[in-house]
Structures are given as structure tokens and as C-alpha cells.
Amino acid sequence: MAEKKYTQSATSTGGGREGHVKGDGGIDMELTAKGTNPEALLAAAWAGCYNGALQLMMKNRGVDVAKHQPEATANVSFYTLDDGGLQLGANMVVKFENQEELEDVQGLLDEAHAFCPVSKLFRGDHVELTVSPA
């Protein structure tokens, strides 16, 4: 069994996608469909986590992180399905300074994706859903 290191929590009230979110770490914001919304928050979480994992993989390989300055951009898209349901899709775009000098870039990206906790969550490997009465 995995050892839990810590937990962060956030609570949504009001209109859901057009409501309010308050949580640990100073999160206290209104959500809007065209502004800060769940997709934007997911993209920010994944980009930050993935870039950290990528830099760790680079260091483990002896790659100079400062020289290559990785930039990870997470894109989270909101889809309407043919059956009327909703779905999210996501992809990561990574750029490096001096990329032509890097070896096995795809291997680095794959290692970071395998290590990144948010990537694991997106794959559904570690999602637990519990419904509790109020």
C-alpha cells in the first residue's frame, strides 16, 4: 500500500462550473466558464507537476536542466459527446532550449509521464470515489 504524504482539499459551492471554490493553499476563487474554470485548474496542476517530473528525469540522466530550460504546456479540452455527455481530453506540449543537443527526448517525456502523479491521475490509475452523507 502507498504511504500518503499529504492531502490538499478544495470545496465547490454555488453553481458548480459557475460557482466558488475554496481550498487549501490559499485557493479562494470564483469559477467562470470562460475564465478560471476546472479545466484551467487541471491544466495548471498537470503542467506544474509534469515539468517537475521532467526536470527530475533530466537530472537523473545528468542533463543540464538550466541549459535546456524545459517548458511544459498542458492543454485540457472540454468536449460534448454525440450522446449528449461531456468529456475532458488532455495533451502535453513540451519545448526545450537547445533541443537538438538532447538525446532520447521521447524517452525523457515518457519517463516524466510515467512518474508524474497528475499524469497517473489522468490515466485513472489512482482515483477513488467515495460518497459520504452530510
Locate predicted features.
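Extended beta-strand/beta-hairpin segments
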Residues: 1-44, 51-134
